[in-house]
Design a protein with these regions (language model features):
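Active-site nucleotide/adenylate-binding loops and adjacent lid/helix of ATP-dependent enzymes
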Residues: 153-234, 239-240, 251-254, 279-291, ...
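Short hydrophobic alpha-helical segments enriched in small aliphatic residues
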Residues: 9, 15-17, 28
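ATP-dependent carboxylate/phosphate-activation module, predominantly the ATP-grasp catalytic core
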Residues: 223, 230, 238-302, 306, ...
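Protein kinase-like catalytic core scaffold
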Residues: 184, 256, 320-323
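Peripheral (often C-terminal) accessory segments that flank ATP-dependent C-N-forming ligase machineries
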Residues: 45, 351-457
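ATP-binding N-terminal substructure of ATP-dependent carboxylate-amine bond-forming enzymes
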Residues: 38-147, 408-412, 419-422, 431-456
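N-terminal amphipathic/hydrophobic targeting modules at extreme N-termini
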Residues: 13-21, 221
C-alpha cells in the first residue's frame, strides 16, 4: 500500500481501505529556510536513530510517544481513532485497531521507510500487549515473549507458575463443592479493571447469586452467548489485608524496580481502586517483595519489557501474588506519580529498554522522604447511581495538585459492577514537605475532599 501525502493541509485517503497510513508533509516548510533546515536535521537524526512503533496513540499513550521523540526516534503510531492525540505527534500514522496485529505487521512491512524500526511498545493492556509481543517477535525486536504474555494473561496459569517457585497465591476453590470456604472471591480468570469481581461471605449469599444468575440466563431472548457467559470464572480464597503495586522494567533478565506504592480499594465489590500512595512504609517487606518480582519475571520468562505486579499482604506480613503482567500499568503511576515523587523518567527508560539502549536503575524508589504523594479517585456508592456534581476540591497547607481530571459528566448513570471504568474523577496530589499527619490520615482527608455527590436511581 502506498502512503498518501498531505497537500495544502488536506489528507488524501481511501475511505474504503481497511487500513491506511499517512505521512506528515514538509511541503510548506520549504518556503522557510530555517524550518526546512530543522526538518532536514530531524530527518538526519531519524536516519541515525530509526523508528519506534507505538501500538496505540490515545491519551495514555502520549507519554510513551513523547519519550521516544525526545530520544530522537521517529514514531509510527497505530490507532483507529483519527482524533487520537498521539497521531498528531507522530511521523507516520497507521489507522487500525491495536488488536489487528497481522494487519499492522503487513502495513509496517510495506512502508518505504528511511530507516529501521528499532523498537515497539504500548502503554495499553490486554490484547494490545499481545500485538506488541507478536510484532516484536516477527521483526526480531525486544518485548515480552508470546509465551510470557499467555501465562500472565491467564490467572490460573500465573498461579501455577508462581506456586512452583514458592510464591504464595490465594487458594483456588472448586465452585461445584463450595461448603465451608467462606468468604471467597469470585472473579473472571482473565480480564482487568476489577470488572465482575465479587466476594461472598456466607452460603445464603452464594445460593442467592446462583439462582439469580440461572434466572437471568433463562430470560435472555438471544441465543448468542454474551462475553460473561463464555468467560471462565474462578473462586479463590479471600486474603485479608492491604494491596501494593510494584512497577519496574526488565532488561537482559535483570529487574529494575521503579516504585512500590500502597493501594486502597472500596470496601464493596468489585473493589474499585481509589488511591495509590507513596511512600511505602513497610520497609521490612521490600526485600521479599523484590525477590518475588525477580523470581516471577524469570519463571514467566518476562524479559526486555515493562513489569507491573499487585500483591496482597495479610496481617501476618505474608505476601500473596494477585496479578503480574508485562505492561506499564495504568492509574497514572508511571507517567505522573513516579516522576513527580522520585524525579525518575520511567518512559525514557522504557523506550531505551525497548530499543536496546542500556537503562539506568531508578533511584530512591525505596527511600521514605518526609513528603507524601498519591493518585486519588472518586468512586460512586455501591450499586447503581447518578452523578449529581463533582466536589470543589480545596487544597490544604502546602499541598500541590499535579493534575485534576473529571472522568464522568453530571447526570451520567454509574454501575459499580462495571469496575474501575465508572470512577468519576482522578486527582494527583503532592503532600507538604513537613507533614504533621500520618500518611493514612492525609489519605483519608484527600478522599473526603474529593468525594462527589451522587443519588440513587
Amino acid at each position: 500500500m502506498i502512503p498518501t501525502r498531505k497537500k495544502f493541509g488536506r489528507e488524501k485517503t481511501n475511505a474504503s481501505a481497511p487500513i491506511r497510513f499517512l505521512l506528515r508533509s514538509s511541503h510548506t516548510a520549504r518556503k522557510n529556510p530555517l524550518t526546512f533546515s530543522r526538518i532536514k536535521r530531524n530527518l538526519r537524526m531519524m536516519k541515525e536513530k530509526g523508528y519506534f512503533l507505538s501500538i496505540g496513540a490515545g491519551p495514555n499513550q502520549v507519554p510513551l510517544i513523547s519519550a521516544a521523540i525526545g530520544l530522537g526516534y521517529s514514531v509510527i503510531a497505530v490507532d483507529r481513532n483519527n482524533h487520537a492525540p498521539g497521531l498528531k505527534m507522530s511521523s507516520l500514522r497507521i489507522m487500525e485497531s491495536v488488536t489487528e496485529y497481522r494487519k499492522i505487521l503487513k502495513t509496517v512491512s510495506e512502508i518505504p521507510l528511511q530507516g529501521e524500526i528499532l523498537g515497539v511498545g504500548t502503554r495499553s493492556y490486554g490484547k494490545a500487549t499481545y500485538t506488541a509481543s507478536y510484532i516484536a517477535d516477527k521483526l526480531k525486536l525486544r518485548y515480552a515473549s508470546l509465551e510470557s504474555v499467555g501465562i500472565c494473561s491467564d490467572k490460573n496459569l500465573l498461579k501455577e507458575t508462581a506456586k512452583k517457585i514458592g510464591i504464595l497465591t490465594p487458594e483456588n476453590y472448586d465452585i461445584s463443592t463450595l461448603k465451608n470456604q467462606f468468604p471467597f472471591v469470585y472473579k473472571p480468570s482473565q480480564g482487568s479493571g476489577k470488572e465482575g469481581i465479587r466476594t461472598f461471605h456466607d452460603p445464603k449469599e452464594w445460593e442467592s447469586f446462583l439462582k439469580s444468575k440461572k434466572k437471568n440466563s433463562r430470560s435472555r431472548v438471544s441465543k448468542k452467548k454474551t462475553n460473561a457467559d463464555k468467560e471462565e470464572w474462578i473462586a479463590e480464597e479471600y486474603i485479608p489485608g492491604f494491596e501494593i503495586t510494584v512497577c519496574g522494567l526488565i532488561q537482559n533478565g535483570k529487574f529494575f524496580p521503579a516504585s512500590i506504592s500502597h493501594k486502597d480499594v472500596t470496601k464493596y465489590a468489585p473493589y474499585l481502586e481509589i488511591a495509590h500512595t507513596l511512600p511505602f512504609l513497610r520497609c521490612e517487606l521490600i526485600g521479599e517483595i523484590l525477590l518475588n518480582c525477580r523470581a516471577l519475571a524469570a519463571a514467566t520468562k518476562m524479559n526486555d519489557c515493562p513489569f507491573v505486579a499487585e500483591f496482597r499482604i495479610n496481617p501476618q506480613g505474608e505476601i500473596y501474588l494477585i496479578e503480574a503482567v508485562p505492561e506499564v500499568g495504568g492509574e497514572f503511576l508511571a507517567d505522573t506519580l513516579i516522576p513527580n515523587y522520585f524525579g525518575s523518567s520511567y518512559f525514557e527508560n522504557l523506550v531505551k529498554l525497548l530499543t536496546g539502549e542500556k537503562i539506568e536503575p531508578f533511584l530512591n524508589y525505596s527511600k521514605i522522604p518526609k513528603k507524601y504523594a498519591g493518585i486519588f479517585f472518586s468512586a460512586p456508592p455501591e450499586g447503581k447511581s447518578k452523578l449529581v456534581e463533582h466536589s470543589e476540591f480545596v487544597i490544604k497547607g502546602k499541598e500541590k495538585i499535579i493534575f485534576d481530571r473529571k472522568l464522568k459528566q453530571h447526570g451520567e448513570i454509574l454501575r459499580t459492577s462495571e469496575g474501575n471504568a465508572i470512577r468519576t474523577r482522578s486527582i494527583g496530589v503532592l503532600g507538604p514537605d513537613q507533614n504533621d499527619q500520618t500518611l493514612e490520615n492525609w489519605k483519608q482527608s484527600v478522599l473526603q475532599r474529593l468525594e462527589g455527590k451522587f443519588e440513587s436511581v
